[in-house]
Regions:
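Short, positively charged
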Residues: 1-2, 8-179
Length: 179
């Protein structure tokens, strides 16, 4: 269950007053995570056409070693192709959000680690992918866990974000599961 707090919402226009569960993410202190990086969330890539050695890549120990190792692989003719998610449950959950979600996220991860952007708006340049990734993020925020089979249901109705300045933002989806 993604619910951290339960609140009653009062809609003054409809007089609708549901009791809803919300997840809480705080920007105070460390940046909040949407999904925990674990073995369940690993993406596996296959290196094709590589003309170097494993040592050529693994000897790189710079402060930006992932980016530098990816650059070295490409310099030596290598191309990284998404192979699979390490965890089958995570893969299945991603495909429930969209049948191509593992491939979309694999592409986004590569772009991020190559230094091609830090924000989704910089890493996703296709309108359809943008919409699908937002749907995935909603699923992660409201119901999906990486290592547990997901049935498509949301276990909370929204998100409370505590901003760095202490302001609160409330995002809610009240009747989404009734569609």
């Amino acid at each position: 269950d993604k619910t951290d707090i339960t609140m009653q919402i009062h809609d003054i226009q409809t007089e609708f007053t549901p009791i809803c569960g919300f997840s809480i993410k705080s920007e105070l202190g460390n940046a909040p995570t949407l999904i925990n990086a674990t073995r369940a969330t690993n993406f596996i890539y296959e290196v094709k056409s590589f003309r170097g050695t494993l040592q050529d890549v693994n000897q790189i120990e710079t402060s930006s070693k992932i980016k530098d190792r990816l650059t070295k692989i490409e310099e030596l003719g290598g191309q990284l192709e998404f192979y699979k998610c390490e965890n089958d449950v995570f893969n299945d959950n991603l495909r429930k959000a969209d049948s191509l979600m593992p491939e979309y996220l694999a592409e986004i991860l590569l772009k991020y680690y190559k230094g091609q952007g830090r924000y989704l708006r910089d890493l996703v340049d296709d309108e359809i992918k943008t919409i699908r990734v937002k749907d995935f993020l909603k699923a992660i925020l409201l119901g999906m866990f990486s290592g547990t089979p997901w049935d498509g249901a949301y276990t909370c109705n929204g998100l409370v974000v505590v901003r760095k300045d202490g302001d609160l933002l409330l995002y809610h989806v009240i009747k989404d599961m009734e569609l």
